[in-house]
Amino acid sequence: MKEALFGLYLVLLVSGLEAAVTKPNSGNFIECLRYQASPENPITDAIFTVDNTTTFLSSYVSYTKNTRFSNPNNKNLLAIVVAKDVSHVQATVVCAKSNGIQIRIRSGGHDNEGLSYVSSVPFVILDMHKLRDITVDVSSKKAWVQAGATLGELYVKIDEASQTLAFPAGICATVGAGGHISGGGYGNLMRKFGTTVDHVIDAELVDVNGKLLNRSTMGEDLFWAIRGGGGASFGVILSWKINLVEVPKIFTVFQVNKTLEQGGTDVVYKWQLVANKFPDNLFLRAMPQVVNGTKHGERTIAIVFWAQFLGRTDELMEIMNQSFPELGLRREDCQEMSWLNTTLFWAMLPAGTPKTVLLGRPTDPVFFKSKSDYVKKPIPKEGLEKIWKTMLKFNNIVWLHFNPYGGMMDRIPSNATAFPHRKGNLFKVQYYTTWLDPNATESNLSIMKELYEVAEPYVSSNPREAFFNYRDIDIGSNPSGETDVDEAKIYGYKYFLGNLKRLMDVKAKSDPENFFKNEQSIPPLLSRVRRDDEL
């Protein structure tokens, strides 16, 4: 069914593309690419333009995850460069800059607001998905991973080398390493080990002048900025060198559901009191979602409690019985498995699914909207009930992720990297809704806005914090071709808190003319930033 829908999607896009408004002349840019690229690595086959409708369209759609922003007919899109070598990246930067063309950098295509493949000014997409090499050194417990590799590919590569090493990153196997790591990616190991950026020890980046830099040549300030501040404001991330972490051979996982009729609200309230205080080895996510009720046509809220424990069932049961008996966990709810198999469990794949599924790069275009929040104090039961009531207004898939903090997240200083959301948070919230009918877009965005407003009294304030990797244009943005510092401070302080000033300082030194920009990039205008106590 998905394949049929995707085929129809391509046909409709091709029809629109053939009738599109003529795009600006990209000839000078293309000629520059051919001149700048290394003769040993010809770039011609890496360039896709509208002149070849089929290949251009396939390249565009394959890594465009949010249909809400999919627009290959955009007259400003001059070309897609699918880099196969570092020289292709360098040539794209040099030629785009010299021709006054904006670059949008796309690794996995998971940018929630489409900023890696959409612009209202002339631009090119620099697609990194073919730069996906991964090397694992078990003896040093380190790995190099290129920006275009997916988390699934990284996890499989680590598992092939060792069953007692892992990397603390996200649960979505198709996310690209370039953007995920640079924004402070997290997963179910974060209470034990922190976020992705806490384990980056080197990086390769192409700067605004087309130079290839590493940690030594870029300097510690820029290296600090790209770990949590997002790489796309500072250059093009080519690869990361990461520390791997030691894990046991056996993990325990479970999934337990509680509907409202089963006392779900009371259980979630208690979860808020204990989830951030569990031993670091335990990550227990609460996932409220809309489900069908027991009666025909009835809908209710079910809270799915997903857990991962670095250890055996016996120890986990002891912790749960002592600290969270309200959940009613039974031994038969638990499954023991390897770290790699936990990634399949979190992907909701059945037991026995081959690990090769993590290597897939499926294209399932859907409409979706996501937002984020940070919670400092337990949400009262009446607040939870207001949230449930608003969720039930959706007529499509909607869920929240309550991701517990505590553990290592409390022990890493907020300025150790550019990712600032550390001690003081009980949990992070992700709001998510998805749909297939384009006619439902306006209604779903409206309800999502209402849900966000309903939650406002119960989350962080001054500022209302947000997670950069859950990009949300609603919290502030600039036009594609401009970066006003006052507007940038609105979204920048929500994403980066007290680290914003240093990020803008780094930007002023590394990209003073603001070549690398998008609607939510970091501006280089340090002189106009107020003091920290004024932000």
Curated annotation (Swiss-Prot):
GO biological-process terms attached to the record: cellular response to hypoxia
Glycosylated residues in this chain: 52, 214, 257, 292, 321, 341, 415, 439, 444
Family matches, as Pfam families: BBE, FAD_binding_4
Description of what induces expression: Up-regulated by MKK4.
Cofactor: FAD
Cross-link 6-(S-cysteinyl)-8alpha-(pros-histidyl)-FAD (His-Cys) residue location(s): 110-172
GO molecular function per UniProt: FAD binding; oxidoreductase activity
Compartments it resides in: Endoplasmic reticulum; Cell membrane; Secreted, Cell wall
Record InterPro entries: BBE, FAD-bd_PCMH, FAD-bd_PCMH-like_sf, FAD-bd_PCMH_sub1, FAD-bd_PCMH_sub2, Oxid_FAD_bind_N
EC number, as in UniProt: 1.1.1.-, 1.-.-.-
GO cellular component: endoplasmic reticulum; extracellular region; plant-type cell wall; plasma membrane
Post-translational events: The FAD cofactor is bound via a bicovalent 6-S-cysteinyl, 8alpha-N1-histidyl FAD linkage.
Note describing how the cofactor binds: Binds 1 FAD per subunit in a bicovalent manner.
Domain FAD-binding PCMH-type: 73-247
Entry similarity comment: Belongs to the oxygen-dependent FAD-linked oxidoreductase family.
Free-text function comment from the UniProt entry: Flavin-dependent oxidoreductase involved in the biosynthetic pathway to 4-hydroxyindole-3-carbonyl nitrile (4-OH-ICN), a cyanogenic metabolite required for inducible pathogen defense. Converts indole cyanohydrin into indole-3-carbonyl nitrile (ICN).
Protein name as it appears in the record: Berberine bridge enzyme-like 3
Species the sequence originates in: Arabidopsis thaliana (Mouse-ear cress)
